[in-house]
């Protein structure tokens, strides 16, 4: 475990397994800490013979981002940015976040890796494979999207639940936790039991470990600023696997089909009953899919 220091960011990472093995890099989603790649999931990948790198994206968890005052999130609100994006400059982009992965691999002396991204992390993974094909052995996209604006959108109420909160953990812990749990239940899928006690513990862990310097709106701005470019997909020539839940309410199955149809050499696996989450009951199946794809 440790940090790599970049010009505007400090990226926290942890490594599981031996570094001389095939390396898997796990890329998290929007304002999602590396803790959501649960330790048992990482350990199962290690048992399959892989070295696993987990990290917090910039502005999340233990990773930080610093900027000059002109781009400071406090100088404008998210609503200001959405109404008048031409008047504001996003503090950073999803491509900047993809560059962080390249810097991390370079810092660790890793020549090539298998890149596994979930949700927004899947978009970051696509951009990484697009910009750094020589560093990318395979690309695996879990519950992700190309962000093609023609694809079905999630329900507005669900988006509001994801991007806003009526309170903070510090000001009202019970209400904050309840809102987070209600959102997770809404995206989880109905084929797998939801462990509310475990989710509560993860929420508390995330709040306790995160840096006081992070500003969640900056990642939201990076995502909404992203402009879909089909050439990114068409230019991906690394072996690619898309794994998606057939009950995903955020990125419906059309998003997975779009990825499969537009990325050359791409395979698709649909998981029955899976929503926009990775239940522990699915770990063995997902590990099997990932391992088989990487090693074939």
Set out the residue ranges of the language-model regions.
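Conserved HGGG/HGGXW glycine-rich cap/lid loop of the alpha/beta-hydrolase fold
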Residues: 9-83
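Acidic beta-to-alpha connecting loop that harbors the catalytic carboxylate
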Residues: 30, 246-248, 273-275
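Conserved acidic catalytic loop of the alpha/beta-hydrolase fold
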Residues: 91, 95-113
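Conserved hydrolase catalytic core segment
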Residues: 111-151
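Alpha/beta-hydrolase
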Residues: 154-231, 238, 258
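Short beta-strand/loop motif that positions the catalytic acidic residue
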Residues: 236, 242-244
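Catalytic active-site module of serine/aspartate enzymes centered on a nucleophile-bearing elbow/loop
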Residues: 266-296
């Amino acid at each position: 475990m440790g940090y790599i220091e970049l010009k505007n960011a400090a990226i926290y990472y942890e490594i599981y397994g031996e570094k001389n093995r095939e390396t898997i890099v796990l890329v998290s989603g929007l304002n999602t800490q590396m803790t959501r790649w649960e330790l048992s999931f990482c350990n199962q990948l290690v048992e399959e013979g892989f070295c696993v790198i987990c990290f917090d994206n910039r502005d999340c968890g233990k990773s930080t981002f610093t900027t000059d005052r002109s781009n400071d999130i406090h100088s404008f609100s998210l609503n200001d940015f959405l109404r008048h994006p031409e008047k504001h400059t996003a503090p950073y982009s999803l491509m900047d976040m993809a560059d962080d992965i390249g810097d991390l691999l370079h810092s660790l002396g890793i020549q090539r890796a298998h890149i596994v991204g979930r949700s927004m992390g899947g978009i970051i993974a696509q951009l990484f494979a697009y910009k750094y094909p020589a560093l990318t052995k395979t690309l695996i996209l879990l519950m992700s999207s190309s962000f093609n604006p023609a694809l079905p959108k999630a329900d507005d109420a669900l988006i509001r639940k994801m991007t806003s909160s009526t309170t903070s953990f510090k000001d009202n812990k019970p209400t904050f936790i309840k809102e987070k749990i209600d959102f997770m239940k809404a995206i989880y899928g109905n084929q797998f039991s939801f462990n509310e006690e475990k989710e509560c513990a993860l929420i508390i862990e995330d709040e306790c470990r995160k840096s006081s310097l992070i500003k969640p709106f900056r990642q939201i701005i990076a995502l909404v600023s992203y402009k879909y470019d089909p050439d990114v997909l068409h230019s991906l020539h690394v072996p690619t696997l898309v794994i998606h839940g057939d009950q995903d309410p955020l990125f419906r199955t059309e998003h997975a089909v779009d990825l499969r149809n537009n990325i050359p050499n791409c395979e698709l696996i649909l998981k029955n009953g899976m929503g926009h989450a990775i239940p522990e009951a699915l770990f063995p199946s997902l590990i099997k899919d990932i391992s088989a794809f990487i090693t074939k």
